[in-house]
């Protein structure tokens, strides 16, 4: 069965974490950079992905509930970001990954709005100066695009490379942060 852009099993549609069932809320919405898929838990935003590239949610144990109301705080701040009125996000994140991935993603959160860093810079920031390729792989697995700003990571040469949403979207996000992208209609509305 498909729900919210990711696959779930008809007979196994619940997430069990530490013996407790968890509901994940989701919604799809258009944005200035293409359709987005939001997924949140009671603890925070779990995923923000570009719809055509949305990853499958672990199918065995996920209970999904479509809810614009549950995702309203995230939607509001993303609207402010796309309109140029927000440079940092204040809502909680529920990041799930390896210790190395979490270290990379936390380092990405330190990159200021409108600035870029190289993969090598991130590797050095997390204390693994030669692990820039592993940093690239962690960026590729970043489940919360835009908010955890992997679009701000570029090659050491200064060129754009590698982005889960595609280089066109990476360029648009960087242009937005430089004030050169038309924001388009608010999220959660029809285009």
Residue ranges and their predicted role:
Residues 130-174, 181:
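Short glycine/serine-rich loop segments
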Residues 10-130, 176-191:
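Basic nucleic-acid-binding alpha-helical/helix-turn surface characteristic of O6-alkylguanine DNA
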